[in-house]
UniProtKB/Swiss-Prot annotation:
Residues 164-184 form a propeptide. Disruption phenotype: Decreases virulence in maize stalks. No sensitivity to Congo Red (cell wall disrupting agent) or sodium dodecyl sulfate (SDS) (membrane disrupting agent), and in vitro cell population growth appears normal. Belongs to the RBT5 family. Residues 1-17 form the signal peptide. It comes from Gibberella zeae (strain ATCC MYA-4620 / CBS 123657 / FGSC 9075 / NRRL 31084 / PH-1). Suppresses host programmed cell death during infection by binding to Z.mays WAK17 isoform 2 and Z.mays LRR5, to prevent activation of Z.mays WAK17 isoform 1 and the downstream hypersensitive response. GO terms for molecular function: metal ion binding. One of its GO terms (biological process) is effector-mediated suppression of host innate immune response. Keywords: Cell membrane, Cell wall, Cytoplasm, Disulfide bond, Glycoprotein, GPI-anchor, Heme, Iron, Lipoprotein, Membrane, Metal-binding, Secreted, Signal. The gene is CFEM1. The keyword Lipid metabolism does not apply. This is Effector CFEM1. It holds the Pfam family CFEM.
């Protein structure tokens, strides 16, 4: 789950998978194990495996990252497995694809990595400064010193921040995911 923010960010730009052959070979053993432990489906029955999609991807995530690396997991494995479960081939198509590949490579297309969306609120605070100025010209009547207080800034958030640091919030999430990957 630590890697989910990065997966969501990069999944939209990845190529669509058309068959089990589009899943990187390094992910196949991890996905095979996850399918076997989390479903009672045959590895080539994508319609069945996609029904238990969440459990399979949760089980396979850390193994895929360990075996393939974060970059391959995000840019290749995740999009390939998500697209296969969006439009899984009919059982006969899955079997014909499986016959063309090694038997250990057919289960990879049935799961994806964990996707969790998180958000954080930025709070901005300001302090008001008070300045006291003594009169410069002496007068005969007693006057009190003039006091001015600048108006306090109002914290802002939301879509009105169209540029600056607000435009980099996706990059921050990606950096957070990269640090989480290094922590393991």
């Amino acid at each position: 789950m630590k890697y989910s923010v990065a997966f969501v960010a990069l999944a939209a730009v990845a190529a669509q998978a058309q068959s089990l052959a589009d899943v990187p070979k390094c992910a196949i053993p991890c996905l095979d194990k996850a399918i076997a432990s989390e479903t009672s489906c045959d590895k080539t029955d994508l319609a069945c495996v996609c029904k238990g999609f969440s459990a399979v991807r949760s089980k396979a995530t850390s193994c895929v990252i360990d075996e393939c690396g974060t970059d391959v997991a995000i840019n290749e494995v995740l999009p390939a497995t998500e697209n296969l479960c969006k439009n899984p081939p009919k059982e006969s198509e899955a079997k014909s694809t499986a016959e063309e590949e090694k038997p250990t490579t057919t289960a990879a297309a049935t799961s994806t990595l964990v996707v969790v969306t998180t958000s954080a609120e930025v709070v901005e605070t300001t302090a008001a400064a008070t300045t006291t100025v003594a009169p410069i010209i002496p007068t005969t009547a007693a006057e009190e010193p003039a006091t001015s207080t600048p108006a306090a800034a109002t914290p802002t958030k939301g879509p009105e921040q169209a540029n600056g640091a607000a435009g980099l919030k996706g990059l921050g999430a990606l950096a957070m995911a990269a640090f989480a990957a290094l922590a393991l």
